[in-house]
UniProtKB/Swiss-Prot annotation:
InterPro entries: ArAE_1 (IPR010343). The chain crosses the membrane at residues 19-39, 74-94, 109-129, 131-151. Disulfide bonds: none annotated. It comes from Bacillus cereus (strain ATCC 14579 / DSM 31 / CCUG 7414 / JCM 2152 / NBRC 15305 / NCIMB 9373 / NCTC 2599 / NRRL B-3711). It is found in: Cell membrane. It is a multi-pass membrane protein. The keyword Plastid does not apply. This is UPF0421 protein BC_2748. Belongs to the UPF0421 family. GO terms for cellular component: plasma membrane. It holds the Pfam family ArAE_1. Signal peptide: none annotated. It comes from the Bacteria.
Length: 351
Protein backbone atom coordinates (compact mmCIF):
# COMPACT_ATOMS: atom_id res chain seq x y z
CA UNK A 1 0.00 0.00 0.00
CA UNK A 2 2.78 2.42 0.92
CA UNK A 3 4.67 1.52 -2.24
CA UNK A 4 1.60 2.37 -4.33
CA UNK A 5 1.30 5.68 -2.54
CA UNK A 6 4.95 6.53 -3.20
CA UNK A 7 4.60 5.65 -6.87
CA UNK A 8 1.51 7.84 -7.24
CA UNK A 9 3.63 10.87 -6.33
CA UNK A 10 5.20 10.62 -9.80
CA UNK A 11 2.11 11.55 -11.80
CA UNK A 12 1.61 12.19 -15.49
CA UNK A 13 2.40 15.92 -15.28
CA UNK A 14 5.68 15.26 -13.45
CA UNK A 15 6.78 12.75 -16.11
CA UNK A 16 5.68 15.08 -18.92
CA UNK A 17 7.63 17.96 -17.36
CA UNK A 18 10.76 15.82 -17.29
CA UNK A 19 10.27 14.76 -20.92
CA UNK A 20 9.62 18.38 -22.00
CA UNK A 21 12.80 19.58 -20.27
CA UNK A 22 14.85 16.74 -21.80
CA UNK A 23 13.59 17.40 -25.35
CA UNK A 24 13.96 21.17 -24.95
CA UNK A 25 17.63 20.81 -24.01
CA UNK A 26 18.22 18.50 -26.99
CA UNK A 27 16.64 21.00 -29.38
CA UNK A 28 18.61 23.92 -27.91
CA UNK A 29 21.87 21.96 -28.12
CA UNK A 30 21.12 21.06 -31.74
CA UNK A 31 20.67 24.73 -32.69
CA UNK A 32 23.48 25.81 -30.34
CA UNK A 33 21.34 28.26 -28.34
CA UNK A 34 21.25 28.75 -24.52
CA UNK A 35 19.09 26.22 -22.68
CA UNK A 36 18.20 27.81 -19.34
CA UNK A 37 15.44 30.17 -20.52
CA UNK A 38 13.94 27.53 -22.79
CA UNK A 39 13.87 25.06 -19.89
CA UNK A 40 12.20 27.57 -17.54
CA UNK A 41 9.54 28.27 -20.16
CA UNK A 42 9.01 24.54 -20.83
CA UNK A 43 8.49 23.82 -17.13
CA UNK A 44 5.83 26.48 -16.59
CA UNK A 45 4.00 25.73 -19.87
CA UNK A 46 2.95 22.21 -18.80
CA UNK A 47 -0.68 22.70 -17.74
CA UNK A 48 -3.48 20.35 -16.62
CA UNK A 49 -4.97 20.45 -20.13
CA UNK A 50 -3.55 20.77 -23.65
CA UNK A 51 -5.93 23.70 -24.23
CA UNK A 52 -4.46 25.61 -21.29
CA UNK A 53 -0.92 24.90 -22.54
CA UNK A 54 -1.75 26.42 -25.92
CA UNK A 55 -3.62 29.42 -24.52
CA UNK A 56 -1.04 30.27 -21.87
CA UNK A 57 1.81 29.61 -24.29
CA UNK A 58 0.35 32.28 -26.59
CA UNK A 59 0.30 34.65 -23.62
CA UNK A 60 3.76 33.82 -22.27
CA UNK A 61 5.53 34.34 -25.59
CA UNK A 62 4.66 38.06 -25.98
CA UNK A 63 5.13 38.56 -22.23
CA UNK A 64 8.65 37.11 -22.39
CA UNK A 65 9.34 39.24 -25.46
CA UNK A 66 8.42 42.35 -23.46
CA UNK A 67 10.63 41.27 -20.54
CA UNK A 68 13.59 40.60 -22.82
CA UNK A 69 13.16 43.95 -24.58
CA UNK A 70 13.12 45.89 -21.32
CA UNK A 71 16.10 43.96 -19.96
CA UNK A 72 18.25 44.69 -23.01
CA UNK A 73 17.13 48.33 -23.20
CA UNK A 74 17.99 49.17 -19.60
CA UNK A 75 21.23 47.17 -19.73
CA UNK A 76 22.30 49.06 -22.87
CA UNK A 77 21.71 52.48 -21.28
CA UNK A 78 22.52 51.80 -17.60
CA UNK A 79 24.80 48.76 -17.64
CA UNK A 80 24.74 45.96 -15.08
CA UNK A 81 23.53 48.19 -12.25
CA UNK A 82 20.96 47.50 -9.55
CA UNK A 83 18.68 50.11 -11.11
CA UNK A 84 18.64 48.10 -14.36
CA UNK A 85 17.26 45.04 -12.55
CA UNK A 86 14.64 47.10 -10.72
CA UNK A 87 13.45 49.03 -13.78
CA UNK A 88 13.36 45.92 -15.99
CA UNK A 89 11.24 44.07 -13.42
CA UNK A 90 8.90 47.01 -12.76
CA UNK A 91 8.32 47.91 -16.40
CA UNK A 92 7.78 44.27 -17.36
CA UNK A 93 5.16 43.75 -14.65
CA UNK A 94 3.32 46.97 -15.51
CA UNK A 95 3.34 46.22 -19.25
CA UNK A 96 2.05 42.66 -18.73
CA UNK A 97 -0.73 43.88 -16.45
CA UNK A 98 -1.76 46.66 -18.83
CA UNK A 99 -1.80 44.26 -21.79
CA UNK A 100 -3.63 41.63 -19.71
CA UNK A 101 -0.85 39.09 -20.09
CA UNK A 102 -1.33 37.96 -16.49
CA UNK A 103 -0.38 34.32 -17.07
CA UNK A 104 3.00 35.40 -18.46
CA UNK A 105 3.95 38.04 -15.90
CA UNK A 106 6.08 35.81 -13.66
CA UNK A 107 8.02 34.14 -16.50
CA UNK A 108 8.54 37.47 -18.26
CA UNK A 109 9.89 39.12 -15.10
CA UNK A 110 12.22 36.20 -14.36
CA UNK A 111 13.45 36.30 -17.96
CA UNK A 112 14.07 40.04 -17.76
CA UNK A 113 16.18 40.01 -14.58
CA UNK A 114 18.00 36.78 -15.50
CA UNK A 115 19.13 38.16 -18.87
CA UNK A 116 20.90 41.20 -17.47
CA UNK A 117 23.96 39.58 -15.82
CA UNK A 118 24.69 37.23 -18.75
CA UNK A 119 24.55 39.85 -21.52
CA UNK A 120 27.58 42.10 -22.01
CA UNK A 121 27.17 43.15 -25.65
CA UNK A 122 25.28 42.41 -28.86
CA UNK A 123 22.05 43.27 -27.10
CA UNK A 124 19.77 42.92 -30.12
CA UNK A 125 21.24 39.51 -30.95
CA UNK A 126 20.71 38.43 -27.33
CA UNK A 127 17.09 39.61 -27.60
CA UNK A 128 16.50 37.51 -30.74
CA UNK A 129 18.14 34.46 -29.14
CA UNK A 130 15.85 34.87 -26.15
CA UNK A 131 12.82 34.83 -28.44
CA UNK A 132 14.12 31.62 -30.00
CA UNK A 133 14.67 29.89 -26.64
CA UNK A 134 11.26 30.98 -25.33
CA UNK A 135 9.57 29.73 -28.49
CA UNK A 136 11.41 26.42 -28.20
CA UNK A 137 10.28 25.88 -24.61
CA UNK A 138 6.65 26.74 -25.38
CA UNK A 139 6.41 24.63 -28.55
CA UNK A 140 8.13 21.56 -27.10
CA UNK A 141 6.15 21.53 -23.84
CA UNK A 142 2.83 22.10 -25.67
CA UNK A 143 3.52 19.20 -28.04
CA UNK A 144 4.55 16.97 -25.12
CA UNK A 145 1.38 17.87 -23.20
CA UNK A 146 -0.72 17.17 -26.28
CA UNK A 147 0.77 13.88 -27.49
CA UNK A 148 2.46 12.24 -24.47
CA UNK A 149 0.08 11.01 -21.75
CA UNK A 150 -2.70 13.30 -23.05
CA UNK A 151 -4.86 14.38 -20.11
CA UNK A 152 -7.92 12.15 -19.64
CA UNK A 153 -9.90 12.95 -16.51
CA UNK A 154 -12.84 10.57 -16.99
CA UNK A 155 -11.40 7.92 -14.64
CA UNK A 156 -10.65 10.57 -12.02
CA UNK A 157 -14.18 11.95 -12.31
CA UNK A 158 -15.61 8.44 -11.92
CA UNK A 159 -13.44 7.82 -8.83
CA UNK A 160 -14.49 11.14 -7.28
CA UNK A 161 -18.16 10.40 -8.00
CA UNK A 162 -17.87 6.99 -6.31
CA UNK A 163 -16.25 8.61 -3.27
CA UNK A 164 -18.90 11.32 -3.17
CA UNK A 165 -21.74 8.79 -3.03
CA UNK A 166 -20.02 6.81 -0.26
CA UNK A 167 -18.91 9.80 1.82
CA UNK A 168 -22.26 11.55 1.48
CA UNK A 169 -23.89 8.40 2.89
CA UNK A 170 -21.36 8.34 5.74
CA UNK A 171 -22.10 11.94 6.71
CA UNK A 172 -25.84 11.23 6.66
CA UNK A 173 -25.13 8.33 9.01
CA UNK A 174 -23.17 10.61 11.34
CA UNK A 175 -26.02 13.12 11.29
CA UNK A 176 -28.71 10.56 12.16
CA UNK A 177 -26.51 9.33 15.02
CA UNK A 178 -26.45 12.89 16.39
CA UNK A 179 -30.22 13.17 15.94
CA UNK A 180 -30.87 9.94 17.87
CA UNK A 181 -28.61 11.16 20.67
CA UNK A 182 -30.44 14.51 20.70
CA UNK A 183 -27.14 16.37 20.48
CA UNK A 184 -25.61 18.77 18.00
CA UNK A 185 -23.48 17.61 15.11
CA UNK A 186 -19.93 16.75 16.15
CA UNK A 187 -16.96 18.82 15.07
CA UNK A 188 -15.64 15.80 13.14
CA UNK A 189 -18.84 15.67 11.08
CA UNK A 190 -18.49 19.34 10.17
CA UNK A 191 -14.89 18.67 9.11
CA UNK A 192 -16.00 15.67 7.03
CA UNK A 193 -18.58 17.88 5.36
CA UNK A 194 -15.89 20.43 4.47
CA UNK A 195 -13.72 17.66 2.99
CA UNK A 196 -16.73 16.41 1.04
CA UNK A 197 -17.24 19.89 -0.42
CA UNK A 198 -13.57 20.05 -1.43
CA UNK A 199 -13.87 16.65 -3.11
CA UNK A 200 -16.93 17.89 -5.01
CA UNK A 201 -15.07 20.99 -6.21
CA UNK A 202 -12.16 18.78 -7.28
CA UNK A 203 -14.51 16.57 -9.32
CA UNK A 204 -16.14 19.61 -10.94
CA UNK A 205 -12.68 20.95 -11.82
CA UNK A 206 -11.83 17.63 -13.49
CA UNK A 207 -15.05 17.92 -15.51
CA UNK A 208 -14.01 21.39 -16.67
CA UNK A 209 -10.55 20.09 -17.63
CA UNK A 210 -12.07 17.23 -19.63
CA UNK A 211 -14.44 19.59 -21.43
CA UNK A 212 -11.58 21.88 -22.46
CA UNK A 213 -9.74 19.06 -24.24
CA UNK A 214 -12.90 17.38 -25.54
CA UNK A 215 -12.37 18.66 -29.09
CA UNK A 216 -8.81 17.31 -29.29
CA UNK A 217 -9.61 13.65 -28.55
CA UNK A 218 -11.90 11.11 -30.17
CA UNK A 219 -14.58 9.57 -27.98
CA UNK A 220 -17.03 6.75 -28.50
CA UNK A 221 -20.75 7.32 -27.93
CA UNK A 222 -20.54 5.22 -24.78
CA UNK A 223 -17.69 7.34 -23.39
CA UNK A 224 -19.61 10.52 -24.13
CA UNK A 225 -22.75 9.16 -22.44
CA UNK A 226 -20.71 8.09 -19.43
CA UNK A 227 -19.10 11.53 -19.11
CA UNK A 228 -22.39 13.41 -19.46
CA UNK A 229 -24.04 11.07 -16.93
CA UNK A 230 -21.30 11.71 -14.37
CA UNK A 231 -21.57 15.44 -15.00
CA UNK A 232 -25.31 15.34 -14.24
CA UNK A 233 -24.70 13.18 -11.16
CA UNK A 234 -22.16 15.67 -9.82
CA UNK A 235 -24.61 18.54 -10.33
CA UNK A 236 -27.27 16.73 -8.28
CA UNK A 237 -24.77 15.56 -5.64
CA UNK A 238 -23.81 19.21 -5.25
CA UNK A 239 -27.43 19.99 -4.37
CA UNK A 240 -27.62 17.03 -1.96
CA UNK A 241 -24.48 18.22 -0.16
CA UNK A 242 -26.04 21.68 0.07
CA UNK A 243 -29.12 20.19 1.78
CA UNK A 244 -26.95 18.09 4.12
CA UNK A 245 -25.04 21.23 5.07
CA UNK A 246 -28.36 22.84 5.98
CA UNK A 247 -29.25 19.78 8.09
CA UNK A 248 -25.93 20.06 9.93
CA UNK A 249 -26.77 23.66 10.89
CA UNK A 250 -30.21 22.90 12.36
CA UNK A 251 -30.43 22.98 16.14
CA UNK A 252 -31.23 19.33 16.92
CA UNK A 253 -31.51 20.04 20.66
CA UNK A 254 -34.70 22.09 20.15
CA UNK A 255 -36.52 19.33 18.25
CA UNK A 256 -39.52 17.78 19.97
CA UNK A 257 -40.41 14.63 18.06
CA UNK A 258 -43.00 12.06 19.05
CA UNK A 259 -41.78 8.47 19.21
CA UNK A 260 -43.48 7.54 15.91
CA UNK A 261 -42.18 10.67 14.14
CA UNK A 262 -38.63 10.01 15.27
CA UNK A 263 -38.85 6.38 14.18
CA UNK A 264 -40.15 7.25 10.69
CA UNK A 265 -37.43 9.88 10.24
CA UNK A 266 -34.71 7.43 11.31
CA UNK A 267 -35.97 4.73 8.96
CA UNK A 268 -36.14 7.24 6.10
CA UNK A 269 -32.58 8.45 6.69
CA UNK A 270 -31.27 4.87 6.83
CA UNK A 271 -33.11 4.17 3.59
CA UNK A 272 -31.49 7.24 1.99
CA UNK A 273 -28.07 6.05 3.19
CA UNK A 274 -28.63 2.63 1.59
CA UNK A 275 -29.75 4.24 -1.69
CA UNK A 276 -26.68 6.49 -1.80
CA UNK A 277 -24.36 3.55 -1.18
CA UNK A 278 -26.05 1.80 -4.09
CA UNK A 279 -25.42 4.89 -6.30
CA UNK A 280 -29.20 5.41 -6.55
CA UNK A 281 -29.57 2.44 -8.89
CA UNK A 282 -32.62 1.24 -7.00
CA UNK A 283 -35.29 2.80 -4.75
CA UNK A 284 -37.70 0.27 -3.24
CA UNK A 285 -41.40 0.74 -2.55
CA UNK A 286 -40.89 0.86 1.22
CA UNK A 287 -38.80 4.01 0.81
CA UNK A 288 -41.61 5.79 -1.04
CA UNK A 289 -44.04 4.85 1.77
CA UNK A 290 -41.67 6.39 4.32
CA UNK A 291 -41.40 9.55 2.21
CA UNK A 292 -45.20 9.79 2.05
CA UNK A 293 -45.37 9.62 5.86
CA UNK A 294 -42.62 12.24 6.14
CA UNK A 295 -44.49 14.50 3.73
CA UNK A 296 -47.61 14.31 5.94
CA UNK A 297 -45.51 15.23 8.97
CA UNK A 298 -44.03 18.22 7.14
CA UNK A 299 -47.40 19.71 6.20
CA UNK A 300 -48.71 19.00 9.69
CA UNK A 301 -45.90 21.09 11.20
CA UNK A 302 -46.51 23.84 8.65
CA UNK A 303 -50.23 24.00 9.45
CA UNK A 304 -49.52 24.12 13.18
CA UNK A 305 -47.19 27.09 12.67
CA UNK A 306 -49.77 28.86 10.49
CA UNK A 307 -52.28 28.90 13.34
CA UNK A 308 -49.68 30.03 15.88
CA UNK A 309 -49.94 33.75 16.76
CA UNK A 310 -46.85 34.85 18.70
CA UNK A 311 -46.52 38.10 20.60
CA UNK A 312 -43.01 38.69 19.24
CA UNK A 313 -40.90 37.84 16.20
CA UNK A 314 -40.60 34.13 15.46
CA UNK A 315 -39.05 31.91 12.80
CA UNK A 316 -41.48 30.80 10.12
CA UNK A 317 -40.00 27.31 10.17
CA UNK A 318 -39.44 25.17 13.24
CA UNK A 319 -36.35 22.96 13.51
CA UNK A 320 -38.55 19.94 12.84
CA UNK A 321 -40.05 21.40 9.65
CA UNK A 322 -36.60 22.45 8.38
CA UNK A 323 -35.25 18.93 8.89
CA UNK A 324 -38.25 17.39 7.16
CA UNK A 325 -37.97 19.83 4.25
CA UNK A 326 -34.26 19.09 3.75
CA UNK A 327 -34.79 15.31 3.92
CA UNK A 328 -37.67 15.50 1.42
CA UNK A 329 -35.50 17.65 -0.85
CA UNK A 330 -32.72 15.06 -0.68
CA UNK A 331 -35.26 12.41 -1.65
CA UNK A 332 -36.21 14.46 -4.72
CA UNK A 333 -32.54 14.55 -5.71
CA UNK A 334 -32.28 10.76 -5.27
CA UNK A 335 -35.19 10.26 -7.65
CA UNK A 336 -33.44 12.43 -10.23
CA UNK A 337 -30.24 10.41 -9.81
CA UNK A 338 -32.19 7.19 -10.31
CA UNK A 339 -33.75 8.53 -13.51
CA UNK A 340 -30.30 9.50 -14.81
CA UNK A 341 -28.97 6.03 -13.99
CA UNK A 342 -31.93 4.33 -15.70
CA UNK A 343 -31.56 6.49 -18.80
CA UNK A 344 -27.84 5.68 -19.01
CA UNK A 345 -28.49 1.94 -18.71
CA UNK A 346 -31.27 2.07 -21.31
CA UNK A 347 -29.14 4.00 -23.83
CA UNK A 348 -26.22 1.60 -23.39
CA UNK A 349 -28.51 -1.36 -23.94
CA UNK A 350 -30.13 -0.13 -27.15
CA UNK A 351 -27.37 2.02 -28.67
Amino acid sequence: MNQDRKWNIVGGRVIKTGIAVFLTVLVCDFFNIPTIFAVITAIVTIEPTATDSIKKGLIRFPASTIGSAYAMTFTFFLGHQAISYALAAMFTIVACQKLRLHAGTLVATLTAVAMIPITANHYFTAFLIRLATTSTGIIVSTLVNFFIFPPHYTKMIFGCTEDLFAKTANIMEEWITALVAGKGVKKETAQDLSKLTLLLHKAIQFVQYEQKDWKYHQHTKKEMRSFLTMQKQLHILQQIIYHIDNLARVSIETCDWSQSEREILQRTIHSIIAILRNRCNEIDEEHFKLIAELDKQFWSYKNDLKDYKPNHYHHHFSSESIILFEVLSIHDMLEELKQISEKYEWENRFN
